[in-house]
A protein has these predicted regions:
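RNase H-like, Mg2+-dependent phosphodiesterase core
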Residues: 1-185
Length: 185
């Protein structure tokens, strides 16, 4: 018996639909660091405004090897119309709670992107139904959005790579804590 592994890649159909409805700046948002016991939560935000900015092998960061994520990160940050990330510390997570910390990280990432493009994002597509809406933005929260939609997948890669790099840096500074083991999601 032969078995096959089907690899699902996200598409840009939602982004294209929103562009056709007049939304020029469509931002994907996702986070990394919601589950681990140590470290910050990081949100990534990616905007593409043409299909030639798509990195073909990008998909949900959880489905990629570290090497492929790093390669994808390099290409995403080079090709995208704009990208950004927001970091909320472990201390702030403890103070705010994880839901508010994720919202804060996403708001920071969004602000970074808006500063880069010089205008307000028209529409947000974000991974997950259990996140809070960002006030005063049109926003779709999509279950498994990081599997389905390119901008969200690219944002998941940005968030994951930035967070992993931080955790590896913490591990070098504080080797007794094993921070390199807290690079989960």
């Amino acid at each position: 018996m032969v078995s096959y592994i089907m690899i699902i890649y996200p598409d840009t159909k939602l982004e294209e639909k929103l562009w056709s409805q007049g939304y020029q700046i469509v931002a994907g948002l996702d986070e990394a660091g919601r589950g681990p016991l140590a470290g910050p939560v990081v949100a990534g935000c990616v905007v593409i405004n043409s299909l030639d900015q798509v990195v073909p092998f990008v998909r949900d960061s959880k489905k990629m090897t570290k090497k492929k994520r790093e390669e994808a990160f390099s290409l995403i940050t080079e090709r995208s119309f704009a990208f950004g990330y927001g970091i909320v510390s472990a201390a702030d997570i403890d103070r705010l709670g994880i839901q508010k910390a994720v919202l804060e990280a996403m708001s920071i990432a969004l602000q970074v992107v808006e500063e880069k493009v010089g205008k307000r994002v028209d529409y947000i597509i974000a991974d997950g139904m259990n996140i809070s809406s960002i006030p005063n933005y049109k926003m779709d929260k999509i279950t498994q959005g990081d599997l389905l939609h390119y901008s969200i997948s690219a944002s998941s890669v940005v968030a994951k790579v930035v967070r992993d790099r931080l955790m590896y840096d913490y591990a070098k500074k504080y080797p007794l804590y094993g921070f390199e083991k807290h690079v989960g999601y």
